[in-house]
Amino acid sequence: MNKKVLTLSAVMASMLFGAAAHAADTRIGVTIYKYDDNFMSVVRKAIEQDAKAAPDVQLLMNDSQNDQSKQNDQIDVLLAKGVKALAINLVDPAAAGTVIEKARGQNVPVVFFNKEPSRKALDSYDKAYYVGTDSKESGIIQGDLIAKHWAANQGWDLNKDGQIQFVLLKGEPGHPDAEARTTYVIKELNDKGIKTEQLQLDTAMWDTAQAKDKMDAWLSGPNANKIEVVIANNDAMAMGAVEALKAHNKSSIPVFGVDALPEALALVKSGALAGTVLNDANNQAKATFDLAKNLADGKGAADGTNWKIDNKVVRVPYVGVDKDNLAEFSKK
């Protein structure tokens, strides 16, 4: 009897151990360029949430702390731990080739997301994909939003010269999103027949505190009373501008951002932010996770999903957000 009990216990323990092993038999390695980036924090949490719905997946999540060398080391460790796919938010897009060579050495597929590698890098490995956006689209939509509100608010034209005197807070120089948003927001305004005059343009590296400091300096400078519109490449910098304008009693100056972060949507609701552009964190996260899981399981990247892959790339569309359609994007 005791032998039977012991045997049964051993079998059950073996089954439980097997189930536990099976429950995490698909390891996916993830690196985020830095955890304290507002937008990437939302993406990271969304990926973690998606993974909870897939009990056979174990995420190995890493904070690269804005250090490409650190990220390279993290990828080496992930590969040594036997991950079946990599999901990589690059620190430096130029490092994609290095990451691909590491992945190729272990025959592991890699899904880059948010920071786009070069076409040459993607084409160099048949198991490399990218999930992101069309960077210029966000600039165009931001330009459309500004044009819409400029036409509806004649009081914004402080000197009545018919052109927008603007300052622009730029993201990381060289980052595809920063370069495209900076170029295309102004191009779209000009294409719509709206003349523009740049008073100031400088980087605040996607950061709220840096943007506040930059805006403080501009509001203390010789062009302070000429500023009619503040344009920011992302919401984090837009929020810094809003803080600075409030401190200088100039909250009536309109500010436009990109990302549609929850905090930014609250500012749109209050009127402190004139508009933003939805950079769809949840769908970027879901597409990244879906592709990585499929590839880890040996399936086609988009199998069983609604994602459309064009030349190894999934593009998640942007949407303009202001008070007129805010209810569609605010959490119920």
UniProtKB/Swiss-Prot annotation:
SUPFAM superfamilies: Periplasmic binding protein-like I. Beta-D-galactose binds at residues 37, 114, 175, 177, 181, 234, 259, 279. Keywords: Calcium, Chemotaxis, Metal-binding, Periplasm, Signal, Sugar transport, Transport. Ca(2+) binds at residues 157, 159, 161, 163, 165, 228. The record marks 97 as: Interacts with membrane-bound trg signal transducer. Residues 1-23 form the signal peptide. It holds the Pfam family Peripla_BP_4. One of its GO terms (biological process) is chemotaxis. Beta-D-glucose binds at residues 37, 114, 175, 177, 181, 234, 259, 279. One of its GO terms (cellular component) is ATP-binding cassette (ABC) transporter complex, substrate-binding subunit-containing. GO terms for molecular function: calcium ion binding; carbohydrate binding. InterPro entries: Bact_Solute-Bind_Prot2, MglB-like_PBP1, Peripla_BP_I, SBP_2_dom. It is found in: Periplasm. It comes from the Bacteria. NCBIfam families: PRK15395.1 (NF011924). The calcium-binding site is structurally similar to that of EF-hand proteins, but is in two parts, with the last calcium ligand provided by Glu-228. The ABC transporter complex is composed of one ATP-binding protein (MglA), two transmembrane proteins (MglC) and a solute-binding protein (MglB). Belongs to the bacterial solute-binding protein 2 family. Part of the ABC transporter complex MglABC involved in galactose/methyl galactoside import. In addition, binds D-galactose and D-glucose and plays a role in the chemotaxis towards these two sugars by interacting with the Trg chemoreceptor. Chemotaxis requires MglB, but not MglA or MglC. This is D-galactose/methyl-galactoside binding periplasmic protein MglB. It comes from Escherichia coli (strain K12).
